[in-house]
Amino acid sequence: MAHSASPSLYRSPQEAMEAPPEEFLYLACLHEGTGVDAPDFLAVVDTNGGRVVHELPMPNAGDELHHFGWNRCSSACHGPDRSHLIVPGFRSSRVHVVNVADDPRKPYIEKVIEPEEVVAKTGYTRPHTVHCMPGDNIVVSMLGDADGNASGGFAVIDAKTFEVKGRWENGGERPPMNYDFWYQPRKNVLVSSEFGEPNAYEKGFDLADVEAGRYGQRIHFWDLERRTLEQTVDLGAKGLLPFELRWLHDPDSEEGFVGAALSSVLWHFHRANGAWAADPVIEVESVPLEGWPFPVPGVMSDLVLSMDDRFVYLANWLHGDVRQYDVTNPAEPKLTGQVWLGGVIGKPTDGPRELNGGPNMVQLSFDGRRLYVSNSLYSSWDNQFYPEMRSWLTRINCDPNGGMELDPGFFVDFHDRPDGPARAHEMRLQGGDCTTEIFQ
């Protein structure tokens, strides 16, 4: 059981796996790029009925809601329970503090941190990943400076007052770029990845920008207590655009995974002889396609690790498949399941309906049985690669012993809406999920 004072915070992965099934989830939905002149919104989706039961619009248009997270998670399990979602605008650099404690199914905006304040106190823009940390801190990875150039730092927000406190890193060397991050308290380490320069990716993808070094290929290891950069691992040509990082949930582990989106390679990082190393363990082959100037890469856009660290699920946004691998031995993953959900290479879609777009974000329930999938990556990239995109949220049923199949009864359509189409991006499950919880 969870702590009595913190009913949705857990002392161990096993405790989280025993939590009741989620009844609803929160979903970041955007109008940016759709032609609809309206603010983005946070949707509340009933996971039993597969329908939107509440929408919380942001106060301004043009935010590009993307990733978001809790003010508290299990790494701070000895304090108050989670009560707020921190919802940044990836394009606007505006940060919304959303109260989910008073009525979890009808959240409301409690505070808005304007981009001018973020820049004044940190010098950073383009907030991405949100993680709570012990000590009443919320840490947010920041991808740009005030002019849209690449930057490799982090912002800190007070988890009680929601005031911006400044930069997280403690001086010294900083990476040239940033994107996702994860940390292991017992091992005193934080790892961060790289996307690219906002001035490059915001306008759409151009291969020339990769060749010009405007996109990343490195992961970085930090001393968590000292908040200083300790080591950088360059992944090279097989590590282009290292997006999402997933440390094993075991708090004593010294290994995890990162997905290189453009190279479509899953890397296994680990500590070896006192230093950090990374090895490619899954390589998704590019597919020749008529009309394309180069073979189509999978674009490994997201991955999630089951709470028991047995399975990793990854999405290939352009190819259109979601894969399940047994990673009992993290250095030698074994494919155990695959579902097709759209894509550009012409594979038939599993299930009762044709899908436009490809699987982008994935989120897994604590018990490892329900995998939620959405299809918007980033507005300008959506329009470039899927100009006729119709956005959706669907669910895959996962066998905890291996294997998975599409749930034909769960489908949320975000295209045919009274106010015009929207696009679905990241999900947060009621009471936490497999990419929010870090254990001490």
Task: State where each predicted segment sits.
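Surface-exposed loop and turn segments in beta-propeller and other repeat-based domains
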Residues: 53-67, 110-123, 167-176, 229-239, ...
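Asp-box/WD-like beta-propeller blade repeats and closely related beta-sheet repeat scaffolds
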Residues: 100-185
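Structural signature of eukaryotic scaffold interfaces centered on beta-propeller domains
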Residues: 3-21, 65-81, 123-134, 182-188, ...
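Short loop/turn segments immediately following beta-strands, especially the blade-tip
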Residues: 44-49, 97-108, 159-162, 223-227, ...
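Beta-propeller domains
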Residues: 171-178, 182-330
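Beta-propeller blade signature
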Residues: 40-46, 151-162, 209-226, 387-400
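Blade-loop segments of beta-propeller domains
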Residues: 51-129
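Short, conserved, GDST-rich strand-edge loop motifs in beta-rich repeat architectures
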Residues: 19-20, 27-37, 79-83, 87-88, ...
